[in-house]
Swiss-Prot record:
The lineage of its organism: Bacteria, Pseudomonadati, Pseudomonadota, Alphaproteobacteria, Rhodobacterales. The gene is ndk. This is Nucleoside diphosphate kinase. The keyword Transferase applies. It comes from Paracoccus denitrificans (strain Pd 1222). Its cofactor is Mg(2+). InterPro entries: NDK-like_dom (IPR034907), NDK-like_dom_sf (IPR036850), Nucleoside_diP_kinase (IPR001564), Nucleoside_diP_kinase_AS (IPR023005). Its EC number is 2.7.4.6. ATP binds at residues 11, 59, 87, 93, 104, 114.
Length: 140
């Protein structure tokens, strides 16, 4: 399997509860390296641009409001098959359906407040990483 990079966002429900370290430990235990990380406060415009593909969905307004409600931690994870591995570590979007030991099973509060975001494809990973990081910020 190839070495990949993927974007991860630790969402406001998790940063508010000081879960960044526990979530990072899950990534590292799964063999993912954190090659870039920063804590930021998204603006409504930034959240709207990042989630533009969901603009016509009924949850878009709630999503962008939530993502700007508290700081988030954006990070680039690297490793063999990082995109799929990250999605496995995160667990199902709905924490009720997530496997034991996954981030969402342990930390998510609801489907909307599900603690983490992860890129779902190589194309999304490239686009999402470039949205938050310059090449100079990626140290691997």
């Amino acid at each position: 399997m190839a070495i990949e990079r993927t974007l991860s966002i630790i969402k406001p429900d998790a940063t508010k509860r000081n879960l960044t370290g526990k979530i990072n430990a899950k990534f590292e235990e799964a063999g993912l390296r954190i090659v870039a990380q920063k804590r930021i406060q998204l603006t409504l415009a930034q959240a709207g641009q990042f989630y533009a593909e969901h603009k016509e969905r009924p949850f878009y307004g709630e999503l962008t409001e939530f993502m700007t409600s508290e700081p988030v931690v954006v990070q680039v994870l690297e490793g063999e098959g990082a995109i799929l591995k990250n999605r496995e570590v995160m667990g199902a979007t709905n924490p009720a359906n997530a496997d034991e030991g996954t981030i969402r099973k342990e930390f998510a509060l609801s489907v909307g407040e599900n603690s983490v975001h992860g890129s779902d494809s190589p194309e999304a990973a490239a686009r999402e990483i470039a949205f938050f990081f310059s090449g100079l910020e990626l140290v691997g």
